[in-house]
């Protein structure tokens, strides 16, 4: 079973690493900075992929696959892009036993290689929009790594779209950041703030970057997804022009957007506890474990457990029985709490006599008596739905309790150690940089949602927390992963 | 629409490339030897992945993800393995702006990186079997490339399993090659011969390689999947020992097995024709296109087409309407034949008056009148099932017609230019090599299936086609992709 997991209170960072490794979600590999995503962790990624892929297709996107390698000259075509990415690339210099004439970068992101194809595919407005997504691995050389959150190689999806007008591309940017918000909140049960990044935090090569930001249990922020308005930057870099409806030539308008296996780290940090993983039911491959208490008429108990599992599965609830006799029920309880199975059901001979079983929810650890009758699947389904909804509400409450509106810099400095801080900013990169230097807090997001803006009075004018200069709006500061 | 596709008769190789590019399945990229899998091609891969992934899970496997990079010293640990793979690897020498202390190979296959993890995960027989699959990209430097069939980077799945006994690992090897055979025949409608490879054709590092071999329309063979019995080779290379039930230490027994995007090339070469792609319905994302003939009461025709599509979709048949007025019905017929939509339905005002529509099957181009009544979905479903079955039978007949049993070397030399040749072989690598040098034909497979062996009298003793020495069995020779 599990090695002991450090408590969150004792050492939050160590708790995270202990949990990831004990629950067999991921492990460091023998390759510097690269992780192995173990089957338990990969199963979560598969559930995420399935939900996201469906949402991408419902919004008109198709999947494709572009090369892993990018010629050095391609990366260099977009000035900000190469400045942002070149220093963190892995570089292939030899292939097939020979030194290459041109170095190949292992993709850190695929704008350049994709736009070199789009240039060939797009001639006229009739070829637009082009709405393509790719599921792939990418590599960014990292000095300090942390499983799922920051590794040299990670898995992600990257959408790359091409449009005839800036209005359409901006619509796409917003559509996709909203898809991410819906996914984060409805599947991951993780509330997120949707909004814009400041210029200094945006993607290298973008005109504008939108993001969703979540709060972890230590009060830090985690950027959970981004959607970029690339303007005509990459079309110009790759000379990708099209004939408009009006018959003139124009450069194509572009977006890109992505989420990665980082989301698994976010999921863990948002919900899990000192016993192990807490998984929202919608992302659990196995939602219910049934543990038979093998006393008295063992065969009858086991048969009951199996028939319960069969009934749940017939009703679309993935359930399984752990009937191993080498481990005690107590050991199993701990093991499945560690693994984050959303609902545990125990059933013994006395329960069967009474026509009941005991179900425990992983998030609250609350036990409920369920009736062993034809409504079993309905009862369990109700527990799972309630758990999904309650996890979101709990995380939302936590975020609200750990968000402070602050007006003086001294309070600001202590407040950013605890959670999100809403404060006035004078809009300059200098102030942003100085605050970062002094506190390590950054501007996470300029929220776009009116209910959030109103709740925190973000549109009331005031003075900058740092410079004292006039400020037209408040922004969200936090320390971040 | 499509550029003209060269006919198979005129130039089979050019036909293939023309088809792949005209149907927008894939394209060469600006990176040497690497392809772009375009949305139409990737959709086929997604259908293949879904079916295979389900079959892997039904046989007890789970997915995981291991690093892209393999330290040079790992590849070197298994002697045959490094000899086979090192010359065709892409090598990363720089990362994060600095030269690396140890070179990293971009994985050509993952046995070594995976066994370096398995060593940590396996201590006792209780940890076995370990049944893991990975969906990933791999890189093998290729001098002469061909879209899907041979490219520097390709996508695949690689299963890597660990077992306590050689019997169990051999069972796994056979289970998975049979899964591949089932997939090839039931989904791809492509008959395959299942059997063993000779020593010279087996995987670098395997004790034994099993394969499925298919015949393309030019009579050449294509290896469509392999399953390797790795013995204890990788366990020994990585010092991966476990405590047996009996309490002694032993090395773990291993298998690996894989199929790749090469299957898309096989699918095209097995079934397609001079008009374009012919897709078996089970691998078609869009199974039915409805083309309204927009004459007379256009709105009524369009409404009928839409209601037909809705009815088909409700019954699980993915159908869509092409109602664009800028292209003629004739243009659309050609376009969807090129794209390989299995069934095309045309419906016009006169059809509606008569209560019928005209459906055409892509494989035979045969037209059938369907009744526009409540049984429409049943009628279409019947067409799709018949098409799936007929495509398999046609390919099987083709293989049988192009397989010859040959007893003299002169006939052999001309026969291998046409198709598969069943002939006696003395069992030596020397003979195998000389035949390859003289004819470019190789021993594709030592069939394992008794019906195939009996049909071609493979177990009757005789004399080697080349050396005249005694031979205990016949084998299958062919030129191959």
From Swiss-Prot, chains A, B:
Record field: catalytic activity: tRNA(Pro) + L-proline + ATP = L-prolyl-tRNA(Pro) + AMP + diphosphate
GO cellular component, one term: aminoacyl-tRNA synthetase multienzyme complex
Keyword NADP in record: no
Subcellular location, principal: cytoplasm
EC class name: ligase
Subunit structure of this chain's protein: Homodimer.
Function: Catalyzes the attachment of proline to tRNA(Pro) in a two-step reaction: proline is first activated by ATP to form Pro-AMP and then transferred to the acceptor end of tRNA(Pro).
Protein name: Proline--tRNA ligase
Gene: proS
């Amino acid at each position: 079973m599990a090695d002991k997991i450090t408590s969150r209170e004792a050492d939050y960072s160590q708790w995270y690493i202990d949990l990831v490794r004990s629950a067999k979600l991921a492990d460091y590999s023998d390759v510097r900075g690269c992780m192995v995503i173990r089957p338990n962790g990969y199963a979560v990624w598969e559930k995420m992929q399935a939900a996201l892929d469906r949402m991408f297709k419902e919004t008109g996107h198709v999947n494709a696959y572009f090369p892993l390698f990018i010629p050095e000259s391609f990366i260099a075509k977009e000035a900000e892009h190469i400045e942002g990415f070149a220093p963190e690339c892995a570089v292939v210099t030899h292939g097939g036993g020979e030194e290459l004439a041109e170095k190949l970068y292992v993709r850190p992101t695929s704008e350049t290689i994709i736009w070199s194809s789009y240039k060939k595919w797009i001639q006229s407005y009739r070829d637009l929009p082009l709405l393509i997504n790719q599921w792939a691995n990418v590599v960014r050389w990292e000095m300090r790594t942390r499983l799922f959150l920051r590794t040299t190689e990670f898995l992600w999806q990257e959408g790359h779209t091409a449009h005839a007008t800036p209005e359409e591309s901006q619509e796409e940017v917003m559509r996709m950041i909203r898809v991410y918000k819906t996914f984060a909140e409805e599947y991951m049960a993780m509330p997120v703030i949707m909004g814009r990044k400041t210029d200094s935090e945006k993607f290298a090569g973008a005109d504008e970057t939108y993001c969703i930001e979540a709060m972890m249990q230590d009060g830090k922020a985690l950027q959970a997804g981004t959607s970029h308005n690339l303007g005509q930057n990459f079309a110009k870099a790759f000379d990708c022009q099209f004939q408009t409806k009006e018959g003139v030539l124009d450069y194509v308008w572009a977006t890109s957007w992505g989420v990665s296996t980082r989301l698994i780290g976010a999921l863990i940090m948002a919900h899990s506890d000192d016993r192990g993983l807490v998984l929202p039911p919608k992302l659990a491959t196995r939602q219910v474990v049934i543990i038979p208490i093998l006393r008295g008429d063992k065969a009858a108990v086991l048969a009951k457990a199996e028939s319960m599992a069969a009934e749940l599965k017939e009703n679309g609830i993935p359930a399984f029985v752990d009937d191993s006799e080498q481990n005690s029920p107590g050991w199993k309880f701990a093991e499945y709490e560690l693994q984050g199975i959303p609902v545990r059901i125990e059933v013994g001979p006395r329960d069967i006599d009474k026509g009941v079983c005991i179900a425990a929810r992983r998030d609250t650890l609350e036990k409920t008596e369920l009736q062993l009758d034809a409504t079993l699947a309905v009862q369990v389904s109700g527990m799972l739905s309630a758990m999904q909804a309650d996890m979101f509400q709990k995380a939302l409450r936590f975020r609200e309790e750990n968000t402070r509106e602050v007006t003086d810099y001294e309070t600001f400095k202590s407040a950013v150690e605890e959670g999100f801080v809403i404060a006035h900013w004078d809009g300059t990169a200098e102030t942003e940089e100085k605050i970062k230097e002094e506190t390590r807090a950054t501007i996470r997001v300029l929220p776009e949602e009116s209910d959030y803006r109103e709740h925190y009075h973000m549109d009331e004018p005031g003075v900058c927390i740092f410079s004292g200069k006039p400020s037209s709006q408040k922004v969200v500061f936090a320390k971040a992963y």
